[in-house]
Amino acid sequence: YIPNVKMSSSESFFDKLKKDVSNYPEYKGELYLEKHQGTYTTQGKVKKNNKECERLLHFAEWICTMAYMQGKEYPHKELEEIWKEVLLYQFHDILPGSSIHRVYEECNARYEILKAKLNCIIDAAVSYLRNDENSYFAVNSIDFERSGYAKHNGEWYKYSLAPYSACKLEKANLPVSLHFSKNVIENEHFKVEFDNKGQIEKILDKHNDYNCVSSSFNAVRIYKDRFVHPYNAWDIDINYTKHKPRNMKLKTSREYIDGNSVIRENEFSYNKSSLKQKIILTQNSPYIKVENEVSWHETHKMLRIDAYPKNFSDKVLCDIQFGNIERSTKTDNKIDYAQFEIPAHKWVDVYDGKYGVAILNDCKYGHRVKDGLISLNCLRSPVYPDKTADRGEHFFTYAIYPHSKKPMESELVKIGYELNNPLRIYKGSLDIKPIFNCDNSNIIIETVFVNDKGNIAVRMYETAGIKTVARVKANINFISVKQTDMLFENAVDVDLDAMTFKPFEIKTLEVKR
């Protein structure tokens, strides 16, 4: 029997459902697909390129808005064309990694062209705004304050940036509270110790006198990833953990200081593959950054980085688009057991009520958080439909963030944004102030751009999952500010001194100047 089908808009579909809502069963929770968990990881290069394009588009929209406010034409046509192509590559077989080889040859080549175009758009806006001086300035494109040290053209500079701002860099006298010895690196926050395999065997949180490592962190492991017919690129065998993994072999290691960071450098190998790794402690930084350069030449293997925190919980908090979700770390029922690999965007966090550890990343999305383990899936090597999938060179960064506060009261969200949005440094001088500020830390101004009407759009969301009343301050002159839907329709008046957000609610402001 084939039911009658009627084409309609999503709005009319849901309006019809509302009339009969009492007749339908109700389910609260995530509709987890018990298939295709490999798509969180397969074809890592296309996933990284997608992330970089999204980041550059975000930066371009904001900086072009700043230039637009000073009289420069906003590049609507160019940005729209790039957005459409980036969204095309988010098609359900391209971005997930389940297309044929030709698709990735073509789209990865196109990504490079798109990134070059976006960098040109950004640089043109910056050039329009800046003054020509014999100095340097940094630009911060996220809704968080940032401070620290940056290296540019061989010189070190100090910066202190408000959200969505730019400021002059000052030449810096580098700090001296960094130390290292054999198998040890240390800053004012942490003392990190390594074993003879290159794994982290101790992370001492100096402020809380607490070692958050149970057995090891940064365990670089190779797991069997057998062909699940016919969905090799799509699926991971649920029983893969029953096969004992192999550790990548540590070949060389050293410790040293570079400017404001103390670094442990590891070189690993396995068969024809190799990994160069830098574990970095930076002055005043509350997290440990791990940069990875992989030459990957395996078949039906997974490269995963495993961590066993001393603190664990029945729940893991996972970053998703415009919010977060709790998932189970248990395996004692069919639903929880089936969720052996879970997706997350910028981080996953396990907090036991007293202490927590987050694993953050800049382009990796597959995680296993079960039985005391946090495992980041870094690379796969399927043979169908692309027999060369993921073979080659890869660069990615992950981070370890130990914390004693609750996740949403800690710096977790900020660090996720910092890791995924590096500073840009330019010659000259430029002083940009944020056009809007919010007095509540769990309201994030996510996007600033110019809409098709020529008005400034400010999109923000609630990130902690709680009802919030916030004051939003405008730092520019305006004729009117309206709250609208995402299509800039159904405009209503808004009280900027008392904006009410539902948990994870997205709000859009339209500013007419």
Where are the model-predicted features located?
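Conserved, mostly hydrophobic/aromatic
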Residues: 9, 86, 398
